[in-house]
Amino acid sequence: MFTRNLKRGMSGDDVLLAKQRLVSLGYLYAATKRTFGNDTLKSVKAFQSANGLEVDGIIGRLTWAALFGEIETTTAAISIPERFTPSARQAIGIALAQVSDVRREICLDALQFAAEAENNPQAMMGFYIRGGNLYNKDLSLNVMTESKLKAYFRRSEYAPYFDGGRDDLMMENALRSMFAVPGCDCSGMIVGLMRKHGIYDAGFDANANTLGGSHTIKTTNPQSGDWACKSGHIGLYVGGGYEVEAAGGAYGIQLSKNRRIFNFLTGKVQRFSAWEYYGDPKRY
C-alpha cells in the first residue's frame, strides 16, 4: 500500500519492498539494503520510461501503482472541476495522484475557487480582496457578502486594488452568484488553506514574502502543493505546470500556466513576469 513518496536518500521497509519489486521485474540487479541509492534511482527511471510515466526517479502514487498493479488512486477518482480544459484536468490529475493526501486536498480546495485563464472564463469563482484570507480564523469560508463587498469598496486605502471599474465588475459577478463568491489576496489564499487543513493554527497569518522566505525550502523540482513565489506575490503549484493564484482585482483567483492570466475587464489574456522560485513548505 502506498504511504509516501520515495526518493533518493530515503530508507525504510517500503523502499526495500519497491526495490525487491524492481528486481523481480528485471530493472534492478539486487535488493539487499533498505536505502534508495543511485542504482535504485536509475532503475526507477527506467521503469517509468518503459511504462509511460513521468521520468523523475521518484516513486510516487502512480509509479507505486504501476509497480504493484494497484489502482487505489487514479486520476479519474480525483474531483478536478469539469469547467477546466481536458488538458489541464489531465495534467493536474496525474500530478495530484502522485502526492500525499494532504497536498492533494489542499490543491483541490484551491482549485474549486479558480477560473482557468486559457478557457475564456465567464465569471470569477473567487475575488481578489486585499487583506482578506480565504478561510477565516473560525475556519469558515470568507464569502464576500453584499455588506462585506460594500465595506471593502469604501476603504480608500484599498482603491488601487479595485478602482477603474473593477469594483463594478466584482459587484456584478457577486450579484450573479447571489453573493456566494469568496475572496482573499495572494498570501491570504495560502494562509487560509494552511488554517483550513490544520497545517498551522487558526490564528496563523503572514505576507507573501514571509511565507516564501521563512516557511519553505527552495526546490527546483516542484510537486503539487508547493508554493510558487516571487517578491510580493505567492501562489499554489497544483501540478502539471499550473498554479492557482489570487492575481488582482480584474483577475480574481485563477488557474494559470506560465503566468498567463485572464483579464475580466478587457476579456483578454495577459502575460505576467515569471515566478522567481518554488518553495517546498516546511510543515508538510
Label every PLM stretch briefly.
Residues 44-48:
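Conserved hydrophobic/aromatic packing and binding residues within compact polymer-binding modules
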Residues 225-226:
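Loop/turn positions that initiate beta-strands
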Residues 265-284:
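Low-complexity, Gly/Ser/Thr/Pro-rich intrinsically disordered linker/tail segments
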Residues 1-34, 73-78:
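Acidic, Ser/Thr/Pro/Gly-enriched interdomain connector segments
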Residues 191-210, 236-239:
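Short, basic/aromatic beta-hairpin or loop at an interaction surface
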Residues 202-204, 236-265:
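Catalytic Cys-His active-site segments of thiol-dependent hydrolases/isopeptidases
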Residues 65, 75-187, 191-197, 231, ...:
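N-terminal capping segments
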